[in-house]
Amino acid sequence: MMETMPNWLMQRAFLTPDRTAIEIEEEKVTFMELHEKVVSVCEHLTHVGVERGQKVAVLMKNGMEMITVIHALSYVGAVAVLLNTRLSREELLWQMDDAEVVCLVTDQDFDAKDVPVYSLAEVMNGPKEEASIQEEFSLEEAMTIIYTSGTTGKPKGVILTYGNHWASAVGSSLNLGLRDDDCWLACMPMFHVGGLSLLMKNIMYGMRILLVPKYDADFIHKALQTRGVTIISVVSKMLTDLLERLGAETYPSSLRCMLLGGGPAPKPLLEACVEKGIPVYQTYGMTETSSQICTLSADYMLTKVGSAGKPLFQCQLRIEKDGVVVPPLVEGEIVVKGPNVTGGYFNREDATRETIQNGWLHTGDLGYLDEEGFLYVLDRRSDLIISGGENIYPAQIEEVLLSHPAVAEAGVVGMSDDKWGQVPAAFVVKSGAVTEEEILHFCEEKLAKYKVPKKACFLEELPRNASKKLLRRELRQLVEEM
């Protein structure tokens, strides 16, 4: 028998109807008002044919409209396929095709070829139809699909169930605690699992969310000072921006947690936070773990510099090398397990079998545990470039470069950047006449802006080992010598 729970938002609206759910700029919406908005969206989506079990793509920016669509799809029992608004049209079409979506709901102009596109504004101005609302959720059913890229650069749809999202929120509350006055400032895109997880916490905890539609460091800085924010999720770039604006001031003591993800933070940044009394909690997680799976509390932010902490209460973590669990201080692959971990990838049985074995997720990330069990992440999928908190996979950029008629070989690595942490740099072996400008322009047409290499260098040949595998470490050395 499948385990079920009451529809989360319906239950929250029943329990605390008049409590503020969402604040966006000057607009405030209670949980009951949010529920009523969602029912209306649900009825309009039902009229255009959205049904239980279907997969529906969502291409929207942060805002009340996106929140209501995500909840409305769960009300009708459809699976929300959340698309990154920063991707190119080609990338989006590929993901929609791969996910077998029946339609796209969006707040922007988009031609999806063979898939019906519904502008939310037009849908809401049209007729509505009584909807069959799911009053219970089965924890085993898929709620969302979010695309991530493996080391091959091929996107994979991570299936996250209601149970995964529930376990993630419970684990976070056991880790960070809950207070009646908690308010989480949400500035992460909701198409990322980190942003989406805040919507889950919002209705499960009954916690106020202050939603920032678009990243604005000045607004966020002021909000932390004046809007009663107690928790915020950030990456290093955001934290640096906030410290610059803070100057000699400090944030209110009510700000009890800065949850820092997107890779290890530099020690000077953490030391500055200690000086300012800012409690930074470093985290490690991924789409496959429904957001964080490890967190380093502020108590250890300087004594365990570089550590991602220990697993959440209901999660397990170990380090393996060649299939064998290794002792502390020995490097190996980070392997995790828990109720927040995905059961697999959509239509990727081989990748699922390779990645998840006996319930343990093989992350592909390298790290080690110290003698006290604190995790240190050494390399995120070894080749991964993390730029402003966004994951960039070199193989995807290389695939685009190799599609250019004048490119014979291509290799991409991360290059240090003061603003973004890292940006892509490309190395190309030419097969015909082509300039650096032409290469970069070609990439701009095929890739999201943040994935476009900031530099393209030409080589006679790329460094490879005896089995002809690309030696990225040598490319990184070339970047450092530039």
From Swiss-Prot:
Family per record: Belongs to the ATP-dependent AMP-binding enzyme family. MenE subfamily.
HAMAP family noted in UniProt: MenE
GO molecular function: ATP binding; CoA-ligase activity; o-succinylbenzoate-CoA ligase activity
Protein EC: 6.2.1.26
KW Lyase (keyword) present: no
Function: Converts 2-succinylbenzoate (OSB) to 2-succinylbenzoyl-CoA (OSB-CoA).
Reaction(s) catalysed by this chain's protein: 2-succinylbenzoate + ATP + CoA = 2-succinylbenzoyl-CoA + AMP + diphosphate
Stored InterPro entries: AMP-bd_C (IPR025110), AMP-bd_C_sf (IPR045851), AMP-binding_CS (IPR020845), AMP-dep_synth/lig_dom (IPR000873), ANL_N_sf (IPR042099), ATP-dep_AMP-bd_enzyme (IPR050237), MenE (IPR010192)
Transmembrane segment boundaries: none
CDD domains: OSB_CoA_lg
Keywords on record: ATP-binding, Ligase, Menaquinone biosynthesis, Nucleotide-binding
Pathway connected to this protein: Quinol/quinone metabolism; 1,4-dihydroxy-2-naphthoate biosynthesis; 1,4-dihydroxy-2-naphthoate from chorismate: step 5/7; Quinol/quinone metabolism; menaquinone biosynthesis
Matches recorded under PANTHER family: LONG-CHAIN-FATTY-ACID--COA LIGASE, NONRIBOSOMAL PEPTIDE SYNTHASE PES1 (EUROFUNG)-RELATED
Identification of the protein by name: 2-succinylbenzoate--CoA ligase
Gene Ontology terms describing biological process: menaquinone biosynthetic process
